[in-house]
Amino acid sequence: MKRLHVILSSMLFTAFMVGPMILPISEAIAAEPLTANYSATPEKGAVEFALLKGYMWKYADGQFHGEKQITQGQFVSSLVTIRGLKDGEPVPQLPQGHWAKATYERAQKAGILTDVEINPDKLLTKEETALLVFNAWKPYRGVKDKGFTNTGALVTWGWMDPAPPGQPKFREDLPVTRSDAAVILRKMWQDKYEIELGEKYALEFHKSLKVVDGYLIGTVPKGDKLINITVQFYTKDNKIVGYGNGESFKSKIESFHSMSFIATNSLDSSIAAVYQYQNLSLLERKKNTQQFSFIE
């Protein structure tokens, strides 16, 4: 499933009615916005971004060597760094003193190593890389679409390039270079950033709400240049009344059957956070942020 984009309010309304998706989100909010002007070449820009953010590293000779096939240990280290993982659990496959042991213990506790044959020196294929991505991102976007291989699902989602022309689109055995990995990891870093920012604004909005004399009163957060925020009220005849960044409202509850909070990336309309309010009097909210698959 490709990432859904906000095109029409009516399309959003349909998506929100699918049902709640509840998942834990880290409370940490990244400090730096995504405003750096990088090279137009995706690989070069992604490498620069990875080095700047500190989730990929150069070799001892001072070179990045983007042409080299990435190892399991390198990719797992990047995932652990992006997730900001601190706690671990035993990984008996690695001996005491092994350079990757502490990192793998953190990855193990977070579920990143589920169904993974532990071998830090292993050169990764697309399928092996995609499995690690989906394991690492389960707290944010749920499980992959069961109708695809890991490779097929990640290509369809838009985080991995398809095979070159003339080959099966979802070919699983192709190698993943360090430059390829940098592109994937930047998308993950950015996705985590926007999800956490969306959660921050969703909570700010929720705390602004109050019910007074049959009216729902609240204020849409001002947001920032990256996140566009919309609050939509749905009337009983399915019309939509909307409010945007920084706007306040006082709406008569009996005129509406539900309300949605929608936070999207203003650059590509990808969905950062969605909450559905079905009972406006009680202010109960259910998370409906887009998942890798709506069917688990």
Short names for language-model regions:
Residues G19-Y215:
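N-terminal propeptides
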Residues K239-K252:
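Solvent-exposed serine/threonine-rich low-complexity stretches and specific carbohydrate-binding patches
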Residues T230-Q232:
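Beta-strand signatures of extracellular beta-sandwich domains
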Residues G214-G223, E296:
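Aromatic/hydrophobic beta-strand junction motif of beta-rich domains
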Residues K2-A30:
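Sec-dependent N-terminal signal peptides of Gram-positive bacterial secreted proteins and lipoproteins
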Residues H257-I295:
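Short, aromatic- and glycine-rich surface loops/edge beta-strands on solvent-exposed regions
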Residues K222-N228, D268:
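Short proline/glycine-enriched turn/loop motifs at strand-loop junctions of beta-rich domains
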Residues T235-D237, L267:
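Solvent-exposed strand-loop boundary residues in beta-sheet-rich modules
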